[in-house]
């Protein structure tokens, strides 16, 4: 039995609240159990200098935590004068993940900034950020479709992420903080709606793990991501038809 009573293949309750920040082109609050992240998407009519003149768009991300998102206060990174290594790694992961399902050429020379701010952390903050940032990004993109700037969403699939690991002797899905802190193996998995992998980040924290354990964790991750994408589709119900048409056209392009 897990510490919170869940089955080994069970996600924590997931809630996605769209349009959470009124000023942003796209936003949501994603809650995965007690982990809560505000995700915003901002449209910018330019690209970074290294992209200029290429005719392509760009997706980039920033990630941060409130000082009391955790059990003890963590100083803001701005007060330290630099972004920490963990934060930089997570920001790059979020950006890479979201770019994998976007047709950058179809964006034109525009940037979408994804800001993921953790307001309460109980494990899985980076994976919740990816799952929520996707929803915020879709809403921001839909605004350009609604305005006539784009004919369709420049997307080729849904995208979500979850954590898996080995706690005790059992492979489990969606680790909370207590489980993560005692896990023998910890892994983050990012996948598309078609079941393709975008990223696998796995570490034997306490001991090496077997190919059989790896396969079991991947199978659990697929179950979790299927459910997370179902939650995304429910949250995005009013843009699902437009999105489905975009995905179909991208798939046959």
Curated annotation (Swiss-Prot):
Molecular function terms, GO-annotated: 3'-5'-RNA exonuclease activity; tRNA binding; tRNA nucleotidyltransferase activity
CDD domains: RNase_PH_bact
Sequence positions that bind phosphate: 86, 124-126
Domain of life: Bacteria
GO biological process terms on file: rRNA catabolic process; rRNA processing; tRNA processing
Disulfide bonds: none
Protein's UniProt keywords contain Metal-binding: no
Keyword terms, alphabetized: Nucleotidyltransferase, RNA-binding, rRNA processing, Transferase, tRNA processing, tRNA-binding
EC numbers, comma separated: 2.7.7.56
Pfam families in alphabetical order: RNase_PH, RNase_PH_C
Function: Phosphorolytic 3'-5' exoribonuclease that plays an important role in tRNA 3'-end maturation. Removes nucleotide residues following the 3'-CCA terminus of tRNAs; can also add nucleotides to the ends of RNA molecules by using nucleoside diphosphates as substrates, but this may not be physiologically important. Probably plays a role in initiation of 16S rRNA degradation (leading to ribosome degradation) during starvation.
HAMAP family: RNase_PH
Family membership noted in the UniProt record: Belongs to the RNase PH family.
Name of the molecule in the record: Ribonuclease PH
């Amino acid at each position: 039995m897990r510490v919170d009573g869940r089955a080994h293949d069970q996600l924590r309750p997931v809630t996605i609240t769209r349009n959470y920040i009124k000023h942003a082109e796209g936003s949501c609050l994603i809650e995965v159990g007690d982990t809560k992240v505000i995700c915003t998407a901002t449209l910018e009519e330019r690209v970074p200098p290294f992209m200029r003149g290429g005719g392509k768009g760009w997706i980039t991300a920033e990630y941060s935590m409130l000082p009391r998102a955790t059990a003890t206060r963590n100083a803001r990174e701005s007060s330290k004068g630099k972004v920490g290594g963990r934060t930089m790694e997570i920001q790059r992961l979020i950006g890479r993940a979201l770019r994998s399902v976007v047709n950058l050429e179809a964006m034109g020379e525009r940037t979408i900034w994804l800001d993921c701010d953790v307001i309460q952390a109980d494990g899985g903050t980076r994976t919740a950020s990816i799952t929520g940032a996707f929803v915020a990004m879709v809403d921001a993109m839909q605004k350009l479709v609604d305005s006539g700037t784009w004919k369709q969403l420049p997307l080729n699939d849904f995208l979500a992420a979850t954590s898996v690991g080995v706690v005790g002797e059992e492979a489990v899905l969606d680790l909370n903080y207590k489980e993560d802190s005692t896990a023998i193996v910890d892994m983050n998995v990012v996948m598309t709606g078609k079941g393709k992998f975008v990223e696998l980040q796995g570490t034997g924290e306490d001991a090496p793990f077997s190919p059989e354990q790896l396969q079991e964790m991947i199978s659990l991750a697929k179950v979790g991501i299927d459910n997370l994408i179902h939650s995304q589709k429910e949250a995005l119900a009013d843009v699902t038809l437009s999105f489905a048409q975009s995905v179909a056209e991208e798939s046959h392009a």
